[in-house]
């Protein structure tokens, strides 16, 4: 029984009243313990593979180039931000959002992102976030917190640094891209930091991404 890693105290207890039923129960209890360990280790393995996949995406990022791709509809766990609250209160909202994401030991698909007004962005203004978003875990996130990002064409760019320091530059770049390709923005701006303080202590080494849904002007 020790070869099955059954504790000595349980073996001693069994030997005091040994019979077929007790032996079967001893094995069933050990089986249950093994299955629980396998499940826990599988979760850890899934998290490791998710992080490695994310790191690989960062490694192969093409920076400074706007791409236009079709994306399917996607669910996001969304926490809205009141437009009238202060900067300190925004930090509190972000903390509450993070609590939702991490409360069940769920690894995020990507870092927590935020949504900015397209009107502010195209004026070169880094405004307050309208909401924070994360990829949800459908097993426990309440449905009322889930928002669908529509399918469609998305213009996306990855760049080194943080948006706060490059807002005007990126605004001009997107404006030129939309005009050149006869496109118009139809949604607000999705912002995420792919490489952050967990991977570097220099914000100039951060890798960020912004994207927005667009439509062709020729459809009108």
Language model features with spans:
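Mid-protein regulatory/catalytic core that forms ligand/cofactor-binding pockets
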Residues: 53-157
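C-terminal regulatory/effector modules of DNA-binding transcriptional regulators
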Residues: 112-220
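Alpha-helix N-cap/loop-to-helix initiation residues
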Residues: 41, 86-87, 163-167
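Short, charged amphipathic alpha-helical surface segments
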Residues: 12-67
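Hydrophobic alpha-helix position signal
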Residues: 1, 101-102, 178
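Short, positively charged
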Residues: 1-13
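Non-membrane alpha-helical structural segments and their capping/turn regions in soluble enzymes
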Residues: 24, 88-91, 168
């Amino acid at each position: 029984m020790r070869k099955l890693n059954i504790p000595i105290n349980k073996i001693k207890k069994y030997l005091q009243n040994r019979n077929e039923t007790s032996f079967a129960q001893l094995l069933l209890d050990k089986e249950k313990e093994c299955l629980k360990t396998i499940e826990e280790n599988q979760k850890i393995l899934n998290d490791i593979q998710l992080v490695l996949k994310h790191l690989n995406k960062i490694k192969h990022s093409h920076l400074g180039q706007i791409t236009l791709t079709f994306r399917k509809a996607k669910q996001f766990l969304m926490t809205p931000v009141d437009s009238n609250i202060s900067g300190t209160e925004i930090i509190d909202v972000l903390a509450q959002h993070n609590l939702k994401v991490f409360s069940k030991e769920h690894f995020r698909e990507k870092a927590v992102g935020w949504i900015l007004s397209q009107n502010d962005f195209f004026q070169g203004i880094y405004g307050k976030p309208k909401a924070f978003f994360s990829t949800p875990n459908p097993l426990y996130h309440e449905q009322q917190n889930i928002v669908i990002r529509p399918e469609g064409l998305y213009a996306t760019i990855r760049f080194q640094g943080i948006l706060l320091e490059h807002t005007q530059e990126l605004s001009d770049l997107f404006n030129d891209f939309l005009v050149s390709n006869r496109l118009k923005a139809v949604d607000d701006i999705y912002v995420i930091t792919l490489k952050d303080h967990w991977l570097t202590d220099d914000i100039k080494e951060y890798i960020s991404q912004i994207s927005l849904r667009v439509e062709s002007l020729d459809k009108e």
